[in-house]
């Protein structure tokens, strides 16, 4: 029998064993759905891709089920989780709890998307799956979507890798003339990168830059010809055209102690200077780190970010 001794450590994400088995070190826990209201929200899982055994987790405010549906539909939020394309899922407690809070705060129907993870499924699998999920949602294949979703108020959101995915879904929606159109996109601490610092304030040390490059080039996207300058990852500096962004407005959230801080600001500036006709808003928390709102959701700054999220959806 082949040995299962660990041969590669990629902390804090995974271990790859000698026999090829991938051991994920976090993001594996699953929180069950419930049609009995939990914090006044009901939830369910629905498969959207039988080919790849992928599902979405849907969250609905319980009070919406009591409304006369005529004229009372609610915003639809499509959410892409983070985790460096390697870990996490819509079913993990951290994302289940976060989407529950978003839904009850913003009174929206949320659809949290599962996508295939690297290294078993390198990029662009995550992008392909995410677009397939959007197409499935827009095909009105689910009763909650048909009964409660207002397709004049469709939003996309994500954090970290999920924010990167959200950007690319917005671009594809614009290029492919997705109809109805996306009203807005929220990108929280978007995972954009490049071989060189984006500006004089992007002062990550060599070890950090090397680690991010190694993870992208060896685990997430080993077939990238340009490494971390791959346009999937280097949205700001690769010459990617953002003018076809297929939504009306974008909210970019950045954190001053996040390695992606300057990239996020540069992305917002690039979008604003492009030929895109929409509006860009930035919210910045200088003393916070990457995805702080997921791990300290009761903090003042997390509440501030949630309030901005709410205002973006209802305005």
Swiss-Prot record:
The gene is CXE3. Pfam families: Abhydrolase_3 (PF07859). The active site is at 160, 258, 290. The keyword Repeat does not apply. Signal peptide: none annotated. Carboxylesterase acting on esters with varying acyl chain length. GO terms for molecular function: carboxylesterase activity. A motif (Involved in the stabilization of the negatively charged intermediate by the formation of the oxyanion hole) lies at residues 81-83. Gene3D superfamilies: alpha/beta hydrolase. This is Probable carboxylesterase 3. The modification N-acetylmethionine is found at residue 1. Keywords: Acetylation, Hydrolase, Serine esterase. It comes from Arabidopsis thaliana (Mouse-ear cress). Belongs to the 'GDXG' lipolytic enzyme family. It catalyses: a carboxylic ester + H2O = an alcohol + a carboxylate + H(+). Expressed in flowers and siliques. Its EC number is 3.1.1.1. Disulfide bonds: none annotated.
């Amino acid at each position: 029998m082949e040995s299962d001794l660990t041969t590669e450590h990629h902390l804090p994400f995974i271990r790859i064993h000698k026999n090829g088995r991938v051991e994920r070190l976090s993001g594996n826990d699953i929180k069950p759905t419930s049609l009995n209201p939990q914090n006044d929200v009901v939830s369910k899982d629905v498969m959207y891709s039988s080919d790849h055994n992928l599902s979405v987790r849907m969250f609905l405010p319980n009070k919406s089920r009591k409304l006369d549906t005529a004229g009372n539909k609610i915003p639809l939020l499509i959410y892409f989780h983070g985790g460096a394309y390697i870990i996490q899922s819509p079913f993990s407690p951290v994302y289940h709890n976060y989407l529950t809070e978003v839904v009850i705060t913003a009174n929206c129907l949320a659809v949290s998307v599962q996508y295939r993870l690297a290294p078993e499924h390198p990029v662009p699998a995550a992008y392909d799956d995410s677009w397939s999920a959007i197409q499935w949602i827009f095909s009105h294949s689910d009763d909650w979507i048909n009964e409660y979703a207002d397709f004049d108020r469709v939003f996309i959101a994500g954090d970290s890798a999920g924010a990167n995915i959200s950007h690319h879904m917005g671009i594809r929606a614009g290029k492919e003339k997705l109809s109805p159109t996306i009203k807005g996109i929220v990108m929280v601490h978007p995972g954009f990168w490049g071989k060189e610092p984006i500006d004089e304030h992007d002062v990550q040390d060599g070890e950090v830059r090397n680690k991010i490059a190694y993870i992208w080039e060896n685990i997430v996207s080993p077939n990238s010809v340009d490494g971390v300058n791959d346009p999937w990852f280097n949205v700001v500096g690769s010459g990617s055209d953002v003018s076809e962004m297929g939504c009306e407005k974008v909210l970019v959230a950045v954190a001053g102690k996040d390695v992606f801080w300057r990239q996020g600001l540069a992305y917002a500036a690039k979008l604003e200077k492009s030929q895109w006709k929409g509006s860009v808003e930035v919210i910045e928390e200088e003393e916070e780190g990457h995805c702080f709102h997921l791990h300290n959701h009761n903090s003042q700054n997390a509440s501030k970010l949630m309030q901005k999220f709410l205002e973006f959806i209802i305005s």
